[in-house]
């Protein structure tokens, strides 16, 4: 008679399953909405496509030192959105750019997307404020309150747009006193 031995501890499959669950949880957390921030409804993706200028942002290493920052959005063949971010790096004397892809999280009538610049890793892109009449400016958040942008169709905006952005973002708990206003004139 052959006796079966039983290993003590978790089965290898269960550890693998746990690790996979943790990775999935981490990835989902990056595409979640910051608490209390609601994406705009009745979003019109075709009107959002095109070039946007970064007017203000919170600081992040991937944009640090860049001027003349823009984001350009166009349709992908798979129905998603192609994202091309570009900025001038004066220290290097050259343009930096990153290309990514974005997909709507809950349907294209809501300004809530997930965007990736690196493989399977996505972050939230939440349009929570928008000039609905002309799509001239947009208030954008990432997965938490450390990501915040004011985008516009032109390199400058009226002071009233900036004031509204600061007021709305501040009321939602964003650290608006840390905003960087992007130089859209320096560089080549």
Residue ranges and their predicted role:
Residues 2, 29-188:
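A beta-rich soluble binding module of mature secreted/lumenal proteins
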Residues 3-19:
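Bacterial N-terminal signal peptides that target proteins for export
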